[in-house]
Curated annotation (Swiss-Prot):
Protein origin, superkingdom: Eukaryota
Residues modified as Threonine amide: 5
Keywords: Amidation, Amphibian defense peptide, Secreted
Location within or outside the cell: Secreted
Gene Ontology cellular-component terms listed: extracellular region
Expression sites by tissue: Expressed by the skin dorsal glands.
Biological role stated in the UniProt entry: Shows neither neuropeptide activity nor antibiotic activity.
Protein's UniProt name: Rubellidin-3.1
GO biological process, one term: defense response
């Protein structure tokens, strides 16, 4: 899971 990319 990626956040703020």
């Amino acid at each position: 899971i990626e956040f703020f990319t």
